[in-house]
């Protein structure tokens, strides 16, 4: 797996009176097995950059390549990219929506067209990996502490078995149990 970011720039609300440059001429290569950290002040473009890695945001200028293919070329499989590059945002607990923890973590893999058995195995393994006890699987995620909610949301991303996971605001994912 490789992601190449080639000279991307991004302008919010381009062509309006509210235009704001978030990224300017950013380039990097992320290879399989690498850990990359982004450090910067609030509003410096870290989250905007991360959103480019799986095509949630299209650069104003420049290109992004996944395994050698431009992700914005016609025919590129964006669904596969998004299943391979997982994003965990600053407040991942805001992406929880199901009535039970286990159902919430099953949502992503289920949408990959996997068998029910494979979906459940992935959910189980991911929840265990982030330290959620089996006896909590059928509780509402909304009854959990903030740290537990974050871990459930992270399990949902991990259950997709992405090649890469990008965390915005990694320190925000430290848990309080």
Pin down the residues of each PLM region.
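A short, flexible loop at the N-terminus of ABC-type nucleotide-binding domains that lies
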Residues: 2, 11-25, 74-77
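The feature captures the beta-strand-to-loop junction immediately N-terminal to the Walker
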Residues: 39-41
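Helix-to-loop junction immediately C-terminal to a conserved catalytic motif
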Residues: 54
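Conserved ABC transporter NBD signature motif
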Residues: 62-73, 81
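Conserved ABC ATPase "signature" region
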Residues: 117-135
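Conserved ABC ATPase signature
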Residues: 140-144, 148
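Single conserved hydrophobic/aromatic residue that forms the stacking wall/gate
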Residues: 169-177
